[in-house]
């Protein structure tokens, strides 16, 4: 029996949308992951304040991953509370599995601004979602660190989807259609609880 391989997808999930689930499923298949854990932020330090409460965001995640047995929710950041730093989350991971932090090319370009980014890169693998056929271009500081430590970035071919949580929130606030942007149970939950209005 080999080492368990776990993908980690952090985010505000405010709200969780179809691209989040598609990325998690693609990563699981392409990287041969046993599980992908979605980690909702308590208070992301680089973002605007969250619109939906932690209980609402957790419930929407539960609804979104129903029917996806290899996806799970890891509430560590919400349970810890306060400012959310990836380094703290990574340090709290139990030993044993091989972990892959899933990030987009925009996050990759900002990675060296993350608190204790070298510690993150030393502890877990970094998997970057890229357009199919595109190559990864890490910032120079990260590229130098990776070469010095004989580490590499894992490419995750993922066709970009024209969906963002901020756009969805704007649409919901304007009572505009969000068809195809949200998992259906999440859309129903948002409507029932009058979120993002």
UniProtKB/Swiss-Prot annotation:
Q: What is its EC number?
A: 2.7.7.18
Look at the named UniProt entry and state the broad enzyme category this protein falls under: transferase
The reply on keyword Ligase is no
Where do transmembrane segments lie in this chain? none
UniProt signal peptide: none
Cite the InterPro entries for this sequence: Cyt_trans-like, NadD/NMNAT, Rossmann-like_a/b/a_fold
Chain coiled-coil ranges = none
Which superkingdom heads the taxonomic lineage of this protein's source? Bacteria
Keywords of the record: ATP-binding, NAD, Nucleotide-binding, Nucleotidyltransferase, Pyridine nucleotide biosynthesis, Transferase
Q: In which pathway does it act?
A: Cofactor biosynthesis; NAD(+) biosynthesis; deamido-NAD(+) from nicotinate D-ribonucleotide: step 1/1
Q: Which Gene3D superfamilies match?
A: HUPs
Q: Which reaction does it catalyse?
A: nicotinate beta-D-ribonucleotide + ATP + H(+) = deamido-NAD(+) + diphosphate
GO annotation terms (biological process): NAD biosynthetic process
The molecular function terms in GO held by this entry are: ATP binding; nicotinate-nucleotide adenylyltransferase activity
Entry's family note: Belongs to the NadD family.
Q: What does this protein do?
A: Catalyzes the reversible adenylation of nicotinate mononucleotide (NaMN) to nicotinic acid adenine dinucleotide (NaAD).
Query: NCBIfam families recorded for this chain?
Result: cyt_tran_rel, nicotinate (nicotinamide) nucleotide adenylyltransferase
What is the designated name of this protein? Probable nicotinate-nucleotide adenylyltransferase
Q: Source taxonomy lineage?
A: Bacteria, Pseudomonadati, Pseudomonadota, Betaproteobacteria, Burkholderiales
The gene name reads nadD
